């Protein structure tokens, strides 16, 4: 179709670029040069004349995005040709955007114009100098609205590629992509709700929180100014725009924030906004005094979810080169409130003094000057407190809460990421058709329900000037001459004949076939037809009615023919050619001539089997013929490759042979060799084919007698005696032997070759590597031991039977099972008169019984039976069962299969559970694993190009194929994961927010804490009386940490111990003030930054849910249930997040009020620092009180011991006095 479209492509008129069907853009929009008015009018005349000639029966509608409010030359010129012109402003408060109502009007006018009449009407788009950023956004909106493209960022980049590289940076000092993408998402959401756009909400913009201080001056900080532009509802029409808020209007001096001092900026605003709003943050540089734009954001209040707007540096319009000015983790939060709740509450900032809180009088500290006289408080100011706070931050960080941090970010990317695939539904057909505009004035609805609110100018000769938006040039931003282009726009402007509608890239070529079967033929020969059925190399064969043998294992020999089928007929499969077998080697001719094609099949003999004649045992073979010259090569037939041969041919002699020396006598008839004399062969390895092939003589050669025995090596090897032909084998080429047939004659089977001193036939030649040679005769090395009888049923019986045409062909030795060795002492030379010598001489004596090799192998094999069975099973399964097709990377496929084993659900049921969003069937861990193993774009393309049997694919590939049945399966899985964790995530976040609110309320409402703080203030003034630090009305919160650092002169107590002692003596009811602060310790472990990240994850998750709900509109029946469940979840989650956002906004205000309560600045002493100081003070106070109690208990015990000691001493003195008195009386009597 693309070729046909190019063939029938009609070039547009000069000066126009075809953007879509019957939609053209003036190519003057892509340049910065301005033509003179006269030349410009001539250019327009030529373009319109060409258009009328090209489309004589069409009507034309032109859109112009002008600068200023005057009627443009473009409109005046096109009016002369009966072209309807609509003009729009080129910007909205400095943003290259239009209000949402004008965007809606433009889209519906275009839809009505293109659909009316006989569908021949044409739309023209034009912008004046510098209007390309807005025109690009309008064109992208048109593509999204008409569903030409999906994905907002991708669509916008496609449009910008039509302009020269660097044009956007040249015309716009700020990157307008984020705000334009936000409004493109508004356009794409038109199908979610029946009413689009939704009603514009009136909100109260409460505050702006900036987390992470941008670096815009030499002191690594900024001095921010917030300005807000919106609709002026106080005007007569209520449609004009104005600056509704500015910090520069206030008389307060601008504060400078530095990264070293704080990391959060909170600016209270409290202004009403509705509809399209532009929020600017400007840095005021005082040296020299100038304004630098930090960021700008444009949004519509109709799409504000949950009364919160969270933005990072990628979602803000910033200067092109200012990306590195923002720290990692920078985020701007705009908090809204309902209009009925917009009245701000005054933050209580009580002055802490003795009169209000009822602390202790100064007289209560009469002993403090005595205890701490001469002891100076720490002179290093905040250093000790700051060091201690750092230690506390390292110890008491929010370890318990950080488990929420990355939970939401796993499921969703940024809402403006490049992976968006948002689509929009068909245009709303319920709107009334747009009539041809030929009047001097056109009414364009600014609101959704009023079509007569705003008047735009139509190109006509009317002298009236319609009312336009007032544009406030509120700041100037120096534009760069040369800037970097982040969009990689094309360097050359498109020609006038270029078409904007981009076709999707062609699919990549299909992957090469995984299984190729090639045969080795001479380069001069054409490829052969399919190989024939296997030939039976025997003069005897089976009856045609006999079923074919089982699938043959590949032969072990080195085959130089291409007839080595690996599957049984019918139909004959292509041979498998593999070079993996290390045992197979290539027999290369010495002259290294190119290999000829394989020989044609022998003629089909009669199906009747003549009875063979009984023949005597074969006589001794004649002497061998002279060896052929080493340089001789057998000519190749010049005939083309043969067609597929008939069914199996029977006969051991070929009909095409090279002339040979006199052959030996004919071979004996086939004999039935008992099982004791030969063992069945093991399954051979896969067949191999190399570049070598058998060279056969001319087809006209008559069939000679039976073939000669194998010749010696072509090299200078000794001439061995020619053995007689071995009994023919009834095995098929490359297949295990079937059961031996009964003898066809009643004559007894001939005995094995007689043993004599004369040389006997050697065993079949072994596997050669490079060249082939016959074995030396018996006794060549002086050995008189008899050779083993030639096995008739193992592999090839002779190289000449059914295969050789008088040519020695190398074959592989039959694979023998390794037997366990008998470790005996070998006798190499039989001594005269010994048993061994007599045994060799007595030929007529009974010989040892024949050994059953098969039984021996089964009993004494070196490999265990289980290993043999496993190997046989593997070999058999690899042949009987076709291999699985592997398209995905092996490691990824293995990991995917391991993951699937953990999901005990069939793939169709799993997909049904995903589409039904059933959290009972799949848990969050399983959903996360499914997200990790979603197919990539490359893997999906690879699977789409696969045309083979899908049953042959591996488990991972089949899993990917199932996932590909659902559109955007990864996005649906992420939505599913968000739904599973949403309830727990919201509950935990709500619990943390409630904890902060409770702790804030407890601290501010605790009367005991207030009295203790007042007591500390009085204590400090008593110590600092008469110094510069005295007569204080309050103290910084970090001063609480210095109470434990100030010691008395005797170093036995600190000021904290004295405070506890004093409170215990004077006001013991205050000692348990910690009971009023139940939630303080838990709140000290919570970081507001973490809560903000969790809140952002919830809001962004809802945005992704909404986007997927919109994108699934076009999925068809497969997503009907998914859409229904997702819509119900979205309605429920929206209310939850809205409640959560209101609670989050309240927590932010309460956290700031807590800092204000202690007279601190929230930017320098945030909520986290306040709670940690108070928690440490509370713990230190309790510890000091306990230590005081222990000290008092110890002193009490000491006093008790001293009292007992004194009492005992007094008692002893009394006893001594009594004794003295008794002695005196006794003396007196005597």
From Swiss-Prot:
Signal peptide: none
Region feature Disordered, mapped onto this chain: 412-432, 460-822, 1187-1230
PROSITE patterns, sorted: C2_TENSIN (PS51182), FH2 (PS51444), PPASE_TENSIN (PS51181)
Segments of skewed composition (Polar residues): 579-591
Biased segments, Basic and acidic residues type: 1187-1215
Recorded GO CC terms: microtubule cytoskeleton; phragmoplast; preprophase band; spindle
GO biological process: actin filament bundle assembly; microsporogenesis
A molecular function GO annotation: actin binding
Listed Low complexity bias regions: 484-496
C2 tensin-type domain: residues covered: 200-339
Active site: 127 (phosphocysteine intermediate)
Residue span(s) of domain FH2: 809-1207
Keywords annotated in UniProt: Hydrolase, Protein phosphatase
Segments of skewed composition (Pro residues): 503-514, 524-535, 545-556, 566-575, 592-630, 637-649, 660-672, 679-688, 699-711, 718-728, 735-766
Record-annotated Phosphatase tensin-type domain positions: 1-194
Assigned protein family: Belongs to the formin-like family. Class-II subfamily.
Name the UniProt record assigns to this protein: Formin-like protein 14
Organism for this UniProt entry: Arabidopsis thaliana (Mouse-ear cress)
Gene from which the chain derives: FH14
């Amino acid at each position: 179709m693309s070729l046909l479209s190019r063939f029938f492509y009609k070039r547009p008129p000069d000066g126009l670029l075809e953007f879509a069907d019957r939609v053209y853009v003036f190519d003057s929009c892509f340049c910065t040069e301005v033509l003179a008015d006269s030349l410009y009018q001539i250019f327009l005349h030529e373009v319109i004349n060409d258009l009328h000639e090209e489309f004589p029966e069409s009507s034309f509608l032109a859109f112009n995005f002008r600068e200023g409010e005057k009627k443009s030359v473009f409109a005046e010129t096109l009016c002369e040709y009966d072209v309807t012109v609509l003009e729009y402003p080129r910007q909205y408060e400095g943003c290259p955007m239009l209000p949402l109502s004008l965007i809606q009007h433009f889209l519906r006018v275009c839809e009505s114009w293109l659909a009316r009449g006989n569908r021949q009407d044409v739309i023209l788009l034009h912008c004046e100098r510098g209007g390309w950023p807005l025109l690009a956004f309008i064109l992208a909106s048109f593509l999204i609205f008409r569903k030409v493209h999906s994905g907002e960022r991708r669509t916008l980049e496609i449009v910008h590629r039509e302009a020269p590289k660097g044009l956007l940076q040249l015309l716009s000092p700020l990157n307008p992509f984020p705000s334009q993408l936000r409004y493109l998402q508004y356009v794409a959401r038109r199908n979610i709700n029946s009413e689009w756009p939704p009603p514009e909400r009136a909100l109260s913009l409460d505050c702006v929180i900036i987390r992470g201080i941008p670096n815009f001056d030499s002191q690594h900080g900024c001095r921010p100014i917030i300005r807000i532009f919106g609709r002026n509802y106080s005007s007569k029409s209520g449609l004009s725009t104005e600056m509704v808020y500015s910090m520069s209007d206030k008389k307060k001096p601008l504060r400078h924030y530095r990264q070293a001092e704080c990391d959060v900026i909170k600016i209270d605003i409290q202004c009403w906004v509705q509809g399209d709003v532009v929020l600017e943050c400007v840095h005021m540089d005082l040296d020299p005094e100038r304004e630098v734009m930090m960021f700008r954001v444009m949004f519509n209040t109709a799409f504000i979810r949950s009364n919160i707007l969270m933005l990072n540096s990628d979602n803000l319009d910033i200067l092109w080169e200012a990306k590195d000015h923002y720290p990692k983790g920078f985020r701007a939060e705009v908090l809204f409130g309902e209009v009925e709740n917009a009245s701000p509450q005054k933050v209580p900032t009580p002055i802490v003094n003795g009169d209000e809180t009822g602390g202790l009088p100064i007289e209560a500290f009469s002993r403090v000057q005595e205890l701490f006289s001469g002891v100076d408080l720490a002179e290093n100011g905040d250093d000790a407190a700051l060091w201690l706070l750092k230690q506390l931050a390292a110890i008491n960080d929010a370890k318990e809460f950080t488990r929420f941090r990355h939970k939401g970010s796993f499921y969703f990317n940024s809402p403006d990421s490049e992976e968006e695939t948002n689509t929009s539904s068909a245009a709303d057909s319920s709107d009334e058709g747009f009539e041809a505009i030929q009047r001097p004035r056109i009414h364009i609805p600014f609101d959704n329900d009023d079509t007569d609110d705003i008047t735009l100018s139509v190109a006509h000769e009317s002298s009236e000037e319609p009312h336009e938006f007032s544009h406030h040039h509120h700041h100037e931003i120096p534009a760069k001459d040369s800037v970097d282009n982040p969009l990689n726009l094309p360097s050359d402007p498109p020609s006038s004949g270029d078409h904007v509608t981009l076709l999707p890239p062609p699919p990549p070529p299909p992957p090469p076939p995984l299984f190729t079967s090639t045969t080795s033929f001479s380069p001069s020969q054409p490829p052969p037809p399919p190989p024939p059925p296997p030939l039976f190399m025997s003069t005897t064969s089976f009856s045609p009615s006999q079923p074919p043998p089982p699938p043959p294992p590949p032969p072990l020999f080195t085959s130089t023919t291409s007839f080595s089928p690996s599957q049984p007929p019918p139909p004959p499969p292509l041979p498998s050619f593999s070079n993996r077998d290390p045992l197979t080697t290539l027999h290369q001719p010495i002259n290294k001539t190119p290999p000829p094609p394989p020989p044609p099949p022998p003629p089909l003999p009669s199906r009747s089997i003549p009875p063979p004649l009984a023949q005597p045992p074969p006589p001794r073979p004649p002497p061998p013929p002279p060896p052929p010259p080493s340089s001789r090569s057998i000519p190749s037939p010049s005939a083309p490759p043969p067609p597929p041969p008939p069914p199996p041919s029977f006969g051991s002699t070929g009909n095409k042979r090279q002339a040979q020396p006199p052959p030996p006598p004919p071979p004996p008839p086939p004999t039935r060799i008992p099982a004791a004399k030969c063992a069945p062969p093991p399954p051979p390895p896969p067949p191999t084919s190399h570049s070598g092939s058998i060279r056969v003589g001319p087809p006209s050669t008559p069939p000679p007698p039976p073939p000669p025995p194998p010749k010696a090596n072509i090299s200078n090897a000794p001439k061995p005696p020619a053995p007689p032909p071995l009994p023919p084998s009834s095995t098929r080429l490359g297949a295990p032997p079937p059961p031996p047939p009964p003898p066809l004659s009643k004559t007894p089977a001939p005995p094995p070759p007689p043993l004599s001193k004369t040389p006997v036939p050697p065993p079949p030649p072994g596997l050669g590597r490079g060249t082939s040679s016959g074995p030396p005769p018996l006794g060549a090395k002086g050995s008189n031991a008899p050779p083993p009888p030639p096995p008739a049923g193992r592999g090839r019986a002779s190289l000449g039977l059914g295969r050789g045409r008088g040519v020695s062909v190398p074959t592989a030795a039959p694979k023998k099972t390794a037997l366990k060795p008998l470790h005996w002492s070998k006798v190499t030379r039989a001594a005269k008169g010994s048993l061994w010598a007599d045994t060799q001489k007595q030929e007529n004596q009974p010989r040892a019984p024949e050994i059953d090799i098969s039984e021996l192998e089964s009993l004494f094999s070196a490999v265990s039976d289980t290993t043999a069975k496993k190997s046989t099973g593997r070999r058999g399964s690899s042949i009987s069962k076709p291999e699985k097709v592997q398209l995905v990377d092996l490691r990824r496929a293995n990991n995917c299969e391991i993951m699937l084993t953990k999901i005990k659900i069939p793939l169709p049921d799993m997909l049904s559970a995903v589409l039904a969003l059933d959290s009972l069937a799949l848990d969050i861990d399983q959903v996360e694993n499914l997200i990790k193993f979603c197919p990539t774009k490359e893997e999906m393309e690879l699977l789409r190009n696969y045309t083979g049997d899908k049953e042959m694919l591996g488990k991972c590939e089949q899993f990917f194929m199932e996932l590909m049945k659902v559109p955007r399966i990864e996005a649906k899985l992420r939505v599913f994961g968000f739904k599973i964790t949403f309830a727990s995530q919201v509950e935990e976040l709500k619990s943390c927010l409630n904890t902060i609110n409770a702790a804030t309320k407890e601290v501010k409402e605790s009367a005991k804490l207030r009295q203790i703080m007042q007591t500390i203030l009085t204590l400090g003034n008593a110590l600092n009386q008469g110094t510069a630090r005295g007569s204080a009305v309050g103290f910084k919160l970090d001063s609480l940490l210095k109470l434990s650092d100030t010691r008395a002169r005797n170093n036995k107590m600190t000021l904290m111990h004295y405070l506890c002692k004093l409170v215990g003596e004077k006001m013991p009811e205050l000692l348990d003030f910690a009971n009023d602060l139940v939630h303080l310790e838990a709140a000290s472990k919570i970081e507001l930054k973490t809560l903000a990240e969790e809140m952002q994850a919830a809001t962004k998750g809802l945005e992704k849910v909404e986007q997927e709900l919109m994108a699934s509109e076009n999925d068809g029946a497969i997503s009907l249930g998914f859409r229904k469940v997702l819509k119900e979840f979205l309605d429920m989650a929206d209310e939850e997040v809205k409640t959560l956002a209101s609670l989050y906004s309240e927590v932010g205000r309460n956290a700031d009020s807590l800092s204000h309560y202690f007279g601190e600045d929230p930017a320098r002493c945030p909520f986290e620092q306040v709670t940690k100081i108070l928690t440490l003070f509370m713990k230190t106070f309790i510890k000091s009180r306990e230590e005081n109690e222990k000290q008092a208990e110890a002193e009490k015990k000491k006093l008790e011991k001293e009292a007992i000691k004194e009492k005992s001493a007094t008692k002893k003195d009394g006893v001594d006095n009594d004794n003295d008195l008794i002695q005196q009386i006794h003396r007196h009597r005597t």
